């Protein structure tokens, strides 16, 4: 626990994971150079082919803050990037690690506002708002203790107590994690590649008794990701259907593993039934049904290599 007003300030290291989005990375790195309180910025480049590695090699600082880049030999997805980046930050003697993707842009006061809520938290982050419509959340929040899902920034701020909502965090979009928590629960599951690694890390943290929260006065701006769910079962629920075979394969595999490990066999079975219903009735597709079955079998068997066939 770090008191911001008394005692030594924590050593805060920002970790950015990037893949082939150099214009967005340039903007984000410039913004991080304007934020006081950062000791260092580390960028993990997932073997980008757009000149990211060369760009990083030419930049030892952003503003007054030391900047280091590390280009991985192969693209290991967000999961591999955050696994390596978090380990790197801890190796660089970080007390707090600020984790983010390359497509978010924290407000200049975002870190300050997060640090006002340092006491008694292990894993906490900002609201992630639509850059084109800052009154809307990019990732809707299900409020604790009920089924209500909120999409509007005003609604989530009204639901907050003392500027925060305990029990909710949206990793890895500008979240802070303490060294103590990393020492306790380890690193993100790199084998997930993409999809669900952030959710799994939050579930693992909660299972270990971590105190998580969203600070509603802190903001990261992020491009809209569109509608995250397609209505199904006569509008009773939604299904996360991606046009990308890679994303769908990882979602089906990793989500089943997360449900089995953290929610139990009934929740896992419900997801299997939901997937079968969606690709049989809602959006019929035999090929997508087969892909889902293969992904789920792989997850149950602990085989996390199947997604590689979708990588060019």
Positions of the model-derived regions?
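Short, acidic, metal-binding catalytic loop of nucleotide-sugar glycosyltransferases
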Residues: 30-39
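A conserved acidic beta->alpha catalytic loop
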Residues: 45-54, 74, 104-105
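Glycine-rich, basic loop-to-helix element that forms the pyrophosphate-binding segment
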Residues: 71-92
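Short beta-strand-to-loop acidic/aromatic patch adjacent to the donor-nucleotide binding site
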Residues: 94-103
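Conserved donor NDP-sugar-binding/catalytic core segment of glycosyltransferases
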Residues: 109-140
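A recurrent flexible, glycine/aromatic-enriched loop bordering the glycosyltransferase active site
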Residues: 157-177
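A short, conserved alpha-helix in the catalytic core of glycosyltransferases
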Residues: 175, 181-186, 191-218
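Non-catalytic, C-terminal membrane-associated alpha-helical segments of glycosyltransferases
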Residues: 260-312
């Amino acid at each position: 626990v770090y008191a911001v007003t008394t005692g030594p300030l924590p050593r805060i290291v920002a970790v950015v994971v990037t893949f082939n989005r150099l214009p967005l990375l340039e903007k984000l790195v410039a913004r991080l150079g304007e934020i006081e309180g950062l000791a260092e910025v580390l960028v993990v480049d997932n073997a980008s082919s757009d000149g990211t590695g060369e760009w990083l090699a030419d930049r030892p600082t952003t503003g007054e803050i030391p900047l280091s880049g590390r280009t991985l030999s192969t693209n290991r997805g967000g999961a591999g990037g955050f696994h390596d980046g978090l380990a790197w930050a801890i190796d660089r003697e970080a007390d707090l690690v600020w984790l983010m993707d390359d497509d978010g842009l924290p407000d200049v006061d975002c870190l300050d506002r997060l640090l006002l809520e340092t006491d008694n938290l292990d894993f906490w982050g900002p609201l992630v708002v639509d850059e084109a419509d800052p009154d809307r959340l990019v990732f809707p929040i299900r409020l604790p203790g009920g089924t209500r899902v909120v999409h509007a920034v005003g609604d989530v701020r009204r639901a907050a107590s003392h500027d925060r909502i305990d029990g909710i965090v949206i990793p890895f979009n500008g979240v802070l994690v303490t060294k103590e928590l990393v020492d306790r629960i380890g690193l993100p599951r790199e084998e997930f590649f993409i999809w669900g690694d952030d959710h799994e890390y939050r579930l693992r943290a909660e299972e270990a008794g971590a105190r998580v929260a969203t600070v509603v006065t802190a903001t990261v701006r992020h491009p809209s990701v569109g509608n995250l769910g397609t209505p199904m079962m006569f509008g009773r629920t939604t299904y996360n259907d991606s046009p990308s075979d890679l994303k769908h394969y990882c979602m089906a595999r990793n989500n089943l593993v997360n449900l089995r490990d953290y929610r139990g066999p009934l929740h896992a079975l419900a997801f299997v039934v939901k997937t079968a219903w969606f690709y049989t009735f809602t959006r019929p597709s035999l090929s997508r049904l087969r892909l889902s079955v293969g992904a789920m079998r792989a997850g149950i068997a602990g085989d996390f290599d199947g997604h590689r066939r979708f990588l060019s």
